[in-house]
From Swiss-Prot:
This is Glutamate-1-semialdehyde 2,1-aminomutase. InterPro entries: 4pyrrol_synth_GluAld_NH2Trfase, Aminotrans_3, Aminotrans_3_PPA_site, PyrdxlP-dep_Trfase, PyrdxlP-dep_Trfase_major, PyrdxlP-dep_Trfase_small. Homodimer. Pfam families: Aminotran_3. It comes from the Bacteria. It comes from Shewanella pealeana (strain ATCC 700345 / ANG-SQ1). GO terms for biological process: protoporphyrinogen IX biosynthetic process. GO terms for molecular function: glutamate-1-semialdehyde 2,1-aminomutase activity; pyridoxal phosphate binding; transaminase activity. It is found in: Cytoplasm. The gene is hemL. Pathway: Porphyrin-containing compound metabolism; protoporphyrin-IX biosynthesis; 5-aminolevulinate from L-glutamyl-tRNA(Glu): step 2/2. One of its GO terms (cellular component) is cytoplasm. Its cofactor is pyridoxal 5'-phosphate.
Length: 429
């Protein structure tokens, strides 16, 4: 039994399932999760001292790599002045100005402590601003664990949503409508049925919780037009894609302007943080200037703001996103080439610093229905073989992979060599 095995058994005695977020339990791939002791650059190290090339990056925020000296120094300097004040700080202003500078659609921004807080607050604001109750989300997209967002599609294309978790009353879920990602016709049909009841559309511009599904050409622009036609707000959830896909997020990459944007992960440099922002007239509707209530004791925490600012400043340096995109393309296409070499059917998607691969015979994967038909058993086998090779991928066939600037030629080549060996073994099985 490894030290990680021992820790997992110990954790299950005091923590539900032994983890503090379900995907960490390895339920999607089987076996025991690796308990991590430290991380540096492109690597993480488990409790048994084993070193892995990391393609999870704490689920996205580690764009510069783990334990980056600029972020570490910013945190240590901030700690000297105290941990939390529950009062305004100049750091909050500096962070707000930096976000607004980088994302043109954001005119004002409110800091919170998590991505879930950001999406939950943005939806409440959209409902209050429009005086409408219903929201529209997309099948396979994840926006945090607020009650109104843990909803799946009903039994027909135009039926009301059904709770996807116990503990959510159907009275809550009925206000959440679910459309098909990358299918404008499904969105139009729902708006035609509820033309004056939908407050907002919320969408991951690149769906990162059904692996990695970019929008097809014109999809985001079509959603913008539908929102304008029916007087609904468009919320782009950039908790995962913000400052990872491009300097101005996925919205900048694809050329679409939302009314509200949610952010998280990246703007904390690895610290717990989130934010939502957008049009000034909408943001002025939030307390204390408006009637929609939102608050948080740790919102704008000085340690998180310091870490985030250090990362954001580094991301503004010349050539950062070109490097990140090139590395991501190289690893994704390398996986595909290795799979093809050994006759393993695989499709790939990638954009900016995100990538995904799917064990399927389909050439392209563009929606949740296709994702659910992929070979998850083969993924689990591939996952553990790569883990044995010292490559740490997301432990679920439904999660995206992430590159960092710390991933160099050595790490990329070692990863692809490992993939080649694993695919060769799978082909013989």
């Amino acid at each position: 039994m490894t030290r990680s095995d021992e820790l997992f058994e110990q954790a299950k005695k005091t923590i539900p399932g032994g983890v503090n977020s379900p995907v960490r339990a390895f339920s999607g791939v089987g076996g025991s999760p690796r308990f991590i002791e430290k991380a540096d650059g492109a690597y993480i190290f488990d409790a048994d001292g084993k070193k892995y090339i990391d393609y999870v990056g704490s689920w996205g925020p580690m764009i510069l790599g783990h334990n980056h000296p600029k972020i570490r120094e910013a945190v240590l300097k901030a700690v000297e002045n105290g941990l939390s004040f529950g009062a305004p700080t100049e750091l909050e202003i500096t962070m707000a100005e930096k976000v607004i500078e980088m994302v043109p659609s954001i005119e004002q921004v409110r800091m919170v402590s998590s991505g879930t807080e950001a999406t939950m607050s943005a939806i409440r604001l959209a409902r209050g601003f429009t005086n409408r109750d219903k929201i529209l989300k997309f099948e396979g997209c994840y926006h945090g664990h607020a009650d109104c967002l843990l909803v799946k599609a009903g039994s027909g294309a135009l039926t009301l949503g059904q709770p996807s978790s116990p503990g959510i009353p159907e009275d809550f879920a009925k206000h959440t409508l679910t459309a098909t990602y990358n299918d404008l016709d499904s969105v139009k049909a729902i708006f035609e049925q509820y033309p004056e009841e939908i407050s907002c559309i919320i969408i991951e511009p690149v769906a990162g919780n059904m692996n990695c599904i970019p929008p097809i050409d014109g999809f985001l622009q079509g959603l913008r037009a539908i929102c304008d036609q029916y007087g609904a707000l468009m919320i782009i959830d950039e908790v995962m894609t913000g400052f990872r896909v491009s300097k101005s997020g996925a919205q900048g990459h694809y050329g679409v302007t939302p009314d509200l944007t949610t952010l998280g992960k990246v703007i904390g440099g690895g610290m717990p943080v989130g934010a939502f922002g957008g049009r000034k007239d909408v943001m002025q509707f939030i307390a204390p200037t408006g009637p929609v209530y939102q608050a948080g004791t740790l919102s704008g925490n000085p340690i998180a703001m310091s870490a985030g600012l250090a990362q954001m400043e580094a991301l503004c340096e010349e050539g950062v996103y070109e490097q990140l995109a090139a590395k991501t393309q190289y690893i994704a296409e390398g996986f595909k080439a290795a799979a093809n070499k050994h006759g393993i059917p695989m499709a790939i998607n990638y954009v900016g610093g995100m990538f995904g691969f799917f064990f399927t015979s389909e050439e392209t994967v563009t929606n949740f229905a296709q994702v659910t038909k992929c070979d998850t058993a083969l993924f689990a086998e591939f996952y553990h073989m790569m883990l044995d090779e010292g490559v740490y991928l997301a432990p679920s066939a439904y999660e995206a992979g992430f590159l960092s600037l710390a991933h160099g030629e050595e790490e990329l080549e070692a990863t692809l060599a490992a993939a080649d060996r694993v695919f060769a073994k799978l082909a013989k099985a």
